[in-house]
């Protein structure tokens, strides 16, 4: 193997929800500036997941952005043909990296922005309310709601997440 054919750095993304591992999957590390970590991974779900407003399916590729100091992650979703489907955002505690693992705790709230920017929707607010986080950790709940509001404010702009992800 020549020096020019180095394998890309890999890590495992671990998504935790309510103290349990929800999903774990391998990803290619694209960058880590000490605060923002970006990775690329194929759709890690089994089969097709149809939300009604978007379908995640085998062949889709996610370019995912995580922050060590922000309460969210942003995932650009592309179809197998390379076309952008949109951006799926998870409200999370700040990401924690440890060795070859990136651990992210999902706080139930989500946001979707379609590729054309016409469909911006808040998701799973009912799950968040039922989670009890506002009672068990009011500071985290407040940070989660503020993060969702901040992402929505970016999502409705004509340039969407362009500046955030640049």
What are these regions (language model features)?
Residues 48-53, 99-100, 130-134:
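A short, polar/proline- and glycine-enriched secondary-structure boundary/capping micro-motif
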Residues 32-35, 80-81, 114-118:
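Short acidic-glycine loop/turn motifs at beta-strand connectors
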Residues 1-60:
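Charge-rich, low-complexity N-terminal segments
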Residues 37-40, 83-90, 118-126:
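Short, well-ordered strand-loop elements centered on a beta-strand within folded domains, enriched
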Residues 107-150:
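A hydrophobic, small-residue-rich beta->alpha segment in the mid-to-C-terminal subdomain
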Residues 147-166:
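Cysteine/selenocysteine-centered motifs that mediate thiol-based redox chemistry or coordinate metal-sulfur cofactors
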Residues 53-96, 102, 106-109:
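Phosphate/ribose-recognition catalytic cores of enzymes acting on nucleotide-derived substrates
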Residues 15-20, 43, 78-80, 93-95, ...:
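Short acidic, glycine-rich loop/turn motifs
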């Amino acid at each position: 193997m020549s020096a020019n054919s180095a394998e890309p750095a890999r890590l495992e993304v671990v998504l935790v929800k309510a103290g349990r591992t929800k999903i774990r999957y391998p990803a290619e590390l694209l960058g880590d500036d000490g605060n923002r970590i970006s990775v690329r991974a194929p759709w890690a779900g089994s089969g097709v997941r149809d939300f009604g407003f978007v379908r995640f399916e085998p062949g889709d590729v996610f370019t995912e952005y995580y922050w060590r100091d922000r309460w969210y992650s942003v995932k650009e979703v592309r179809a197998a043909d390379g076309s952008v489907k949109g951006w799926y955002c998870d409200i999370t505690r700040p990401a924690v990296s440890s060795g070859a693992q990136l651990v992210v705790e999902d706080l139930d709230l989500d946001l979707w922005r379609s590729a054309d920017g016409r469909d911006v929707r808040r998701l799973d607010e009912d799950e968040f309310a039922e989670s009890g986080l506002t009672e068990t950790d009011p500071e985290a709940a407040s940070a989660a709601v503020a993060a969702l509001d901040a992402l929505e404010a970016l999502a409705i702009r004509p340039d969407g997440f362009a500046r955030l992800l640049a």
